[in-house]
Design a protein with these regions (language model features):
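C-terminal and late-domain segments of enzyme folds
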Residues: 1-20, 25-46, 73, 121-123, ...
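A short acidic, amphipathic alpha-helical/loop segment
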Residues: 11, 63-67, 96
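Portal/gating segments that form or line small-molecule/metal binding sites
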Residues: 24-83, 87-89
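Residue-level marker for well-ordered alpha-helical positions
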Residues: 38, 62, 94-95, 155
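General beta-strand structural signal in soluble alpha/beta enzymes
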Residues: 52-53, 75-77, 107-110, 169-172
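Alpha-helix/helix-capping structural signal
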Residues: 79, 112-113, 176, 183
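Class I SAM-dependent methyltransferase SAM-binding "motif I" and its flanking Rossmann-like core
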Residues: 80-154
């Protein structure tokens, strides 16, 4: 949902393989902020899809599982990852999302909505230093978003990996996205020419960072996928 840059949004919609995919925004991490919901509709009502959202403050239905499973794509927004996961667990949304994933529904998101799918991630949900947070575990390894967008993300991820507090994994600059198929890393894509993804792991007492080839979705890059 980058303003005036729909490249990643279009990429997500294309993965559904249908003419007008049903995409549902889940704004739990922002406490269902209305402004955030409005931004989602502003972005996706312009595109070939059927947008909706799932509020847990004012649920659209009693049967949340059926509501989720009816969608082609779930798009989870950013905010407080720790609080989001706690609310999901209380309402069984975590289980419903896993069932959706097992049934072929595309799970996507940004920031908190990216961290949540992994075994663990780097979060600012707790005041103070960035810390490890356990995710849903649908994707193996750890994840760190905002790798270039926030000054303390890269050093904090390195610190946590080197100290053994978190396992190795994949980091992503703002504007970069990680595409997994059946739980296996498939490719990295980006909406910005300079945005990259990185493999980050501990080796012989040091943290090793390697750039993952990242396809820019603008210009000729769109023809490569």
């Amino acid at each position: 949902m980058e303003p005036d840059n729909p490249l990643l949004d279009l990429y997500i919609l294309r993965q559904a393989g249908t003419g007008r995919p049903k995409i549902c925004f889940v704004p739990t991490a922002s406490s269902d902020a209305q402004g955030y919901i409005d931004r989602f509709y502003d972005a996706f009502q312009r595109l070939e899809c059927t947008p909706s959202h799932l509020s847990l403050v004012q649920p659209p239905t009693v049967d949340l599982e059926d509501f989720i499973l009816d969608k082609d794509i779930i798009y989870v927004g950013g905010g407080n990852t720790k609080s989001m996961l706690a609310v999901w667990k209380e309402r069984s949304v975590d289980r419903y999302l896993k069932t959706a994933w097992e049934n072929g529904v595309i799970l996507s998101g940004l920031s908190a909505g990216s961290i949540c799918w992994f075994e663990e991630g780097v979060t600012d949900s707790i005041p103070g230093d960035l810390t490890r947070l356990e995710g849903l575990g649908l994707l193996s390894g750890s994840h760190c978003p905002h790798y270039d967008g926030e000054a303390d993300r890269r050093p904090s991820y390195h610190r946590l990996i080197q100290s053994g507090q978190i396992g190795g994994g994949i980091a992503a600059d703002d504007g970069a996205a990680l595409h997994y198929v059946d739980g296996v890393f498939h490719r990295a894509v980006s909406s910005r020419p300079e945005a990259k993804a990185y493999e980050v792991r501990a080796m012989e007492g040091h943290v090793v960072e390697a750039v993952i080839p990242t396809v820019y979705l603008g210009e000729a890059g769109r023809a490569m996928i």
